[in-house]
Amino acid sequence: MSISQAPRAIASKNIDLIGYNDLKERPAFKIAMQEVNGRFYLYLSHFWVSGWSVIDVTEPDKPEYLNFIEGPDNTWTLQVQVAEGILITSLEKIPPGWGTRPDDPPEAEGIYIWDVSTDPATPKLLSHWETGSDGTHRNFYNGGKYAHLSACCPGYDGQIYRILDVSDPSSPKEVSKFALPEQKQGGKEELEEGLRIFQHGPAHAENGRAYLPYARGGMVVVNIEDINNPTIVSRLNVYPPLGSAIAVHTVYPYFSKGFAIANSEALKEKCDEPLNYTAIIDISDETNPRLKSLFPVPEPPKGYTHKNFCERGGRFGPHNQHHAQGLDCLEQKEDRIYLTYFNAGLRIYDISDPNLPREIAYYIPSDPTKRLGLLPETLVTQSEDVLVDRRGYIYVTDKNHGLHILKCSI
C-alpha cells in the first residue's frame, strides 16, 4: 500500500506520516521487534483474529507484509515479546464482550515459544507452556534465561507473577511465583467480587527487581535477586481516587533517573469511570515510592469536532508506553515518553524535568471508515500500542486501522 492510500491525520504536531500497511484488514494490537542482518522485523498480534503477523519495516515507507501465523481457535493471542531470536506469544481465555465464545474454553492457554533466529519471517514453534488455568496476558522477555509472565494460576484470583526458566526454550520450567495476599482463594484477605486485583503485566525485570503493574492493587516492587524466592519491597496504591479497574496498567522504571513512569488504562467509553492518568513516581527510595508529578491531559486541537476528547466517543485516556526493554533495535531515550491515548492518538512527552512533564508532539489518525471489530461502540480512532526503533521510526496500531509508521520531527 502506498502512503497516498494511508488514512490521513485529523491533526498532528511535530510528527510526520512515513508509511502505512492495512495488514490485510487484520486489526493490530501489540508490537515487538527484532533486527536480523540489518533488517527490521515487526511481530504483531491482532484483535478479533487469532494469530500473528510478520512485517519487514527495513524500508519504513514501504512496509512489507511477510507472513501470517494462524493461532488457536477461540483464544486471545494479544501479547508478543521477542529477543535473542526467541518469540514468546501469549495465549489467553477471551473475556466477555469481545464477540467470541466466552463460555467455551480456549483452544490453548499459556504461552507459545518460537524460534525466529534463522528465519525471522517463519517462526518455528519450539514449545507450549500451560498455566493450568486461563492463560497469560502481558509478559516480559528481553533475552537471557528468564521470562516474566502475567499468568493465571490455580488457587489464585486473577493473574499473578510467574517466572519461567527458558534457557532451554523447547522445555520451559517454572522457577517461582509471586502473588499478593488478596489473591489467594479462600484466604483471610480474599477480596469480594468486583474489588479483586490482578497482575496486569508486564513485569519490568531489571537490576534484581521486578516492577509490577497490579491494576487496583497498585505499583508493586518485588525483590528477585533470589529468583527462586521473590519477596515484596513496597507497594504504592493510586486507586482510589485515580484510575479505572486497571488503575496501574504499566510501570516502566528508569533507574538512572530515580523514577518510574506509570499509567492506568482507560476502559469505559466517554470517560465513564474515575480519572485516568500518567504519572512520574519517585523510586529513589524503593521502600517508599511516592507520586512526583502528573502528565497534562491532552487537549483537542483548534477546530476539532468536540470541545474535549471524552465527548468524542470511544475510549479516551492512556494505554501503552513505548517499552525499550534494553533492546538494541529500539530507541533508548530517557527524556521522552511515547504514549498511545486511544481517541487522542499518539502523544509524545518531554520528561527532562520530571517535576513538569510537557507534551511536545501528537498524531491523531483519521477515524476508520470500515468496522473490523465490535469495538469501540462509536467508530473512532483508538490508538493502541506504540514502539520506536533505534532509527526513530514510530509504529502505532489501532483497533480498526492498520499499522501507522511515523517520525517525530523534533
Task: Name each region found by the language model.
Residues M1-I410:
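Feature marking well-ordered beta-strand scaffolds used for ligand recognition
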